[in-house]
C-alpha cells in the first residue's frame, strides 16, 4: 500500500460513511446497487469490515439528504471524484446566464444545486432524475419546475420530449452510461435543442486516455471501476465540434451545439 497516496482518499471516504446514521447505513447496504459514491463508501466501509455494492434508485433515495454534503467534502479536499465541482457548476451557470430566461433541461439534477440558482434567476427548469427522493428535495426549492422520474439510460421520459431547450445540462450523471450509450443519448438530445442551443456536461472527464489513467493511479483504491468517464479525444470522433474545459485534474465541462 502506498501510504502517502492512499491515506487522504481513505480518510475522506471514511468521513463520508460516518455522515450516514447507522439505521440508514444498514438500509443502504440492503438495497445497494449503483452510485457515484460507490468507491468512497466502499473504502470507508472496509474499515468497519462492511461490503457495499452499487446503488439502485432506493440507494439514491437513502443518500439524497446527504448528497450535497458528501460532494462538498470531496471538492474542498480537492480529491477524486468531485475536485473542481464548484468550478464546474460555476462555469455552467455563467454560460446559461448569457441567455435571458433560458429554457433548461437538467438530466440527473439531484437535489437541484445548479438548477435552483438558475430557477431563482428566471430560467424555466425541466428535469429528469432516477430518484423520487431527489425529485422531492428539488421540488421544494423549485415548485414550478417540471421534474420527472425516469431512467435516462432509456432516453427522455415522454413529457420532456414535447419541448425544445436553450440548454440541456448533465452534471455528474452521464458517467453511468457506456460510451456507446453516451454517443447515442447525446445524438438524441441534440434533436431537442432550440436553434443555437447547447448541451453542457459537467463531469469527471479527461482530454486524453492518458490523463484518465494518471488520475486513476493517483486515486488508488478510491477509483470507481464501475463508472465510465468521458475521454474527450475519443468522443470527438463522433462529435468534432465538441469543446472541453478542464476544471481540475479529474473534472471538466464539455459543450456541444
Report residues per predicted region.
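Extreme N-terminal basic, low-complexity initiation segments
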Residues: 2-9
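A short glycine-rich, Lys/Arg-flanked "PGG" loop and its adjoining helix->strand segment in the class I
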Residues: 183-195
Amino acid at each position: 500500500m502506498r501510504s502517502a497516496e492512499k491515506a487522504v482518499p481513505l480518510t475522506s471516504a471514511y468521513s463520508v460513511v460516518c455522515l450516514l446514521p447507522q439505521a440508514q447505513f444498514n438500509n443502504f447496504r440492503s438495497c445497494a446497487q449503483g452510485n457515484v459514491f460507490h468507491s468512497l463508501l466502499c473504502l470507508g466501509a472496509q474499515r468497519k469490515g462492511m461490503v457495499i455494492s452499487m446503488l439502485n434508485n432506493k440507494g439514491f433515495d437513502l443518500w439524497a439528504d446527504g448528497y450535497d454534503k458528501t460532494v462538498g467534502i470531496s471538492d474542498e479536499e480537492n480529491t477524486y471524484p468531485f475536485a473542481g465541482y464548484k468550478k464546474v457548476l460555476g462555469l455552467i451557470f455563467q454560460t446559461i446566464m448569457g441567455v435571458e430566461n433560458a429554457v433548461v433541461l437538467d438530466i440527473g439534477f439531484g437535489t437541484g444545486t445548479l438548477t435552483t440558482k438558475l430557477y431563482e434567476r428566471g430560467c424555466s427548469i425541466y428535469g429528469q432524475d432516477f430518484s423520487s427522493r431527489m425529485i422531492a428535495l428539488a421540488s421544494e426549492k423549485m415548485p414550478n419546475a417540471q421534474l420527472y422520474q425516469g431512467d435516462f439510460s432509456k432516453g427522455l421520459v415522454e413529457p420532456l420530449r414535447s419541448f425544445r431547450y436553450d440548454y440541456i445540462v448533465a452534471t455528474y450523471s452521464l458517467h453511468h452510461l457506456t460510451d456507446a450509450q453516451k454517443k447515442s443519448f447525446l445524438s438524441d438530445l441534440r434533436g431537442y435543442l432550440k436553434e443555437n442551443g447547447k448541451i453542457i456536461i459537467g463531469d469527471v472527464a479527461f482530454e486524453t486516455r492518458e490523463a484518465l489513467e494518471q488520475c486513476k493511479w493517483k486515486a488508488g483504491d478510491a477509483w470507481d471501476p464501475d463508472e465510465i468517464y468521458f475521454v474527450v479525444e475519443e468522443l470527438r470522433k463522433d462529435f468534432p465540434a465538441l469543446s472541453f474545459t478542464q476544471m481540475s485534474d479529474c473534472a471538466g465541462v464539455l459543450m456541444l451545439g
